[in-house]
Amino acid sequence: MLYNILFPLSSDYTILNVFKYITFRSVWSLITALILSILLGPYFIRWLQRINFKQQIHEDVKIHKSKTGTPTMGGVLICFSSLCSTILWSDLTNIYVWLTLLVFIGFSFIGFLDDYIKILHHQNKGFSAKVKLLAQVVVAGIAMLFLVSEPAYSTKLAFPFFKSLHPDFGYFYVPFAILVMVGASNAVNLTDGLDGLAIAPVIVSIFVLSVYIYVTGNVKFSQYLQVDYIAGVGEVAVFCGALIGAGLGFLWFNAYPAQIFMGDVGSLGLGGVLGFLAVLCKQELLLLIVGALFVLETLSVIVQVGYFKWTGGKRIFRMAPLHHHFELKGIPESKIIIRFWIISITFGLIALSALKLR
């Protein structure tokens, strides 16, 4: 909004030229969302406590009984802070910004309804898996239909570390992209089981993808680093900045011991938009590296369920997802969280190195 209002005046006031720089607006978008979420956090937490929007703890995780009653739906705070900051600092005529917001709001709304059902019925289960999956596919599908209709966007796939490999998926690209978004959404949802466990890796992943998005939308950088150029995509880096800031602000209250949980409104929304950002900058496969922690958590569930059915009741892990396995082994929660953060940062750096190693 500020860009649309102030930048046209730069011919008369040269200081306003600063608004044309995506990097400047991304940084201030981050700062704005961070301040907004930290300032609103205490009031929001008290309001959730007053209306009794509290977390229902899974009955199998007995060591988490002390967390029962902690306010949930903190993802609303992330969503509100990042949306306000994005609208304030981004170019509101950019189609890619609006598509990103569509995915973020859509997936967050699915999570919101899921959380509300849990709270309303005082249980740990909301939507059925089929209903939730269908809703996610619909939101992702609508976004993809708009995205592939953009002339600058292609259905080719990029392979990390292999600059000359760009197979065209054609009609199969849209279902593939939907799979990426839905998969990322549910992977983050599975990871969100300990205080601060999911939000920090999400921040790391968003930061890495924001670099790729900025490069993808910059003619010179994309040519130098041999990344597919997509005009206008770089503006989404402003949204990424807002989401990082809102995430950091949420972590202020979600760090161990948590004062608030993000709920499905946070995990589904963040995961869905994480997948869309990867699709947007043509780094769908890189997401496997960027979000390696989410992949590991998801695989632990798949392996556990598959092995349980195959052997008629035996388990590989004490409990899945993976973070619960380590909890039941007696490792302190705070240590598990920090170690998982280290894993996330390490894979984030590996993903960044792929920019040059092409």
Curated annotation (Swiss-Prot):
Keyword Cell membrane part of the UniProt annotation: yes
Pfam families attached to this UniProt entry: Glycos_transf_4, MraY_sig1
Domain of life: Bacteria
GO aspect biological process, one term: cell wall organization
Enzyme Commission code(s) on record: 2.7.8.13
Topological type in the membrane: Multi-pass membrane protein
GO molecular function: metal ion binding; phospho-N-acetylmuramoyl-pentapeptide-transferase activity; UDP-N-acetylmuramoyl-L-alanyl-D-glutamyl-meso-2,6-diaminopimelyl-D-alanyl-D-alanine:undecaprenyl-phosphate transferase activity
Cofactor(s) it depends on: Mg(2+)
PROSITE patterns registered for this protein in UniProt: MRAY_2
Localization of this protein: Cell membrane
InterPro entries: Glycosyl_transferase_4 (IPR000715), PNAcMuramoyl-5peptid_Trfase (IPR003524), PNAcMuramoyl-5peptid_Trfase_CS (IPR018480)
Pathway in which this enzyme or protein is active: Cell wall biogenesis; peptidoglycan biosynthesis
GO cellular component, one term: plasma membrane
Record's keyword terms, sorted: Cell cycle, Cell division, Cell membrane, Cell shape, Cell wall biogenesis/degradation, Magnesium, Membrane, Metal-binding, Peptidoglycan synthesis, Transferase, Transmembrane, Transmembrane helix
Stretches that traverse the bilayer: 27-47, 69-89, 92-112, 133-153, 169-189, 196-216, 233-253, 260-280, 285-305, 335-355
Catalysed reactions, as listed in the record: UDP-N-acetyl-alpha-D-muramoyl-L-alanyl-gamma-D-glutamyl-meso-2,6-diaminopimeloyl-D-alanyl-D-alanine + di-trans,octa-cis-undecaprenyl phosphate = di-trans,octa-cis-undecaprenyl diphospho-N-acetyl-alpha-D-muramoyl-L-alanyl-D-glutamyl-meso-2,6-diaminopimeloyl-D-alanyl-D-alanine + UMP
Function field: Catalyzes the initial step of the lipid cycle reactions in the biosynthesis of the cell wall peptidoglycan: transfers peptidoglycan precursor phospho-MurNAc-pentapeptide from UDP-MurNAc-pentapeptide onto the lipid carrier undecaprenyl phosphate, yielding undecaprenyl-pyrophosphoryl-MurNAc-pentapeptide, known as lipid I.
Family from the record: Belongs to the glycosyltransferase 4 family. MraY subfamily.
Name of the protein in question: Phospho-N-acetylmuramoyl-pentapeptide-transferase
Lineage start: Bacteria, Pseudomonadati, Thermodesulfobacteriota, Desulfovibrionia, Desulfovibrionales
Name of the gene: mraY
